């Protein structure tokens, strides 16, 4: 128990710097654009031929989905997001790689940034809008970027770790032994008893 508490504390001490930095960057960017875009004509600042900064409140989930249920759902979104952040933190504590740790830190930082918006503003502020001719990508914010970066890191970590495990297994066992072990694992339940 003491070892687990120590691991949780060390994970918090290490991850909090990353998470807090990402949350500060996200909240400062939102604050700046809220303060400066509300006075622009059409609530928009044209940056390039394919990028605008726009003043948009997202009352739904990612990319504005379910926004029509806002009056019933904001409390549900806050509760769900809080549970997800706690679960992601648990996964980060269990993570065995630096990439996994970094990936979870980015996802948690982005999720907390959007959670702060929901708690204190009632909706998530989105401002980055990419478009090309008739195609328009849904408006998003830096917290969404952090979540996406974190997910990409976690996917890469999963596949690179899987590859390393497979290579180490091949060094120590031949293919027949690996297949036999996999078959034994498939035929054993979670209590270690044979299913057959």
Swiss-Prot record:
InterPro entries on file: Peptidase_A8 (IPR001872)
Segments crossing the lipid bilayer: 43-63, 75-95, 100-120, 135-155
Active site: 126, 144
Pathway entry: Protein modification; lipoprotein biosynthesis (signal peptide cleavage)
Pfam families xrefs: Peptidase_A8 (PF01252)
Principal localisation: membrane
Keywords carried by this UniProt record: Aspartyl protease, Cell inner membrane, Cell membrane, Hydrolase, Membrane, Protease, Transmembrane, Transmembrane helix
The EC number(s) this enzyme carries: 3.4.23.36
GO MF annotation terms: aspartic-type endopeptidase activity
Reactions accelerated catalytically: Release of signal peptides from bacterial membrane prolipoproteins. Hydrolyzes -Xaa-Yaa-Zaa-|-(S,diacylglyceryl)Cys-, in which Xaa is hydrophobic (preferably Leu), and Yaa (Ala or Ser) and Zaa (Gly or Ala) have small, neutral side chains
Membrane topology according to the record: Multi-pass membrane protein
GO CC aspect terms: plasma membrane
GO biological process, one term: proteolysis
Record PROSITE patterns: SPASE_II
UniProt-annotated location(s): Cell inner membrane
Stated family: Belongs to the peptidase A8 family.
Known function: This protein specifically catalyzes the removal of signal peptides from prolipoproteins.
The protein's name: Lipoprotein signal peptidase
Organism from which the protein derives: Rickettsia canadensis (strain McKiel)
Gene: lspA
């Amino acid at each position: 128990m003491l070892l687990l508490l120590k691991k949780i504390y060390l994970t918090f001490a290490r991850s909090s710097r990353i998470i807090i930095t990402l949350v500060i960057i996200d909240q400062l960017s939102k604050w700046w654009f809220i303060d400066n875009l509300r006075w622009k004509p059409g609530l928009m600042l044209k940056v390039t031929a394919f990028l605008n900064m726009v003043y948009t409140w997202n009352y739904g989930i990612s990319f504005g989905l379910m926004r029509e249920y806002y009056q019933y759902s904001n409390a549900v979104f806050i509760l769900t997001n809080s549970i997800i952040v706690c679960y992601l933190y648990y996964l980060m504590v269990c993570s065995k790689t630096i990439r996994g740790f970094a990936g979870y830190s980015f996802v948690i930082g982005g999720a907390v940034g959007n959670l702060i918006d929901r708690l204190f503003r009632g909706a998530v502020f989105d401002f980055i809008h990419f478009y090309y001719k008739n195609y328009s990508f849904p408006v998003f914010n830096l917290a969404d970027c952090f979540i996406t970066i974190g997910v990409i890191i976690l996917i890469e970590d999963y596949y690179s770790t899987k590859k390393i495990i497979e290579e180490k297994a091949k060094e120590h066992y031949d293919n027949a032994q690996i297949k036999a072990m996999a078959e034994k694992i498939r035929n054993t339940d979670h209590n270690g008893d044979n299913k057959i």
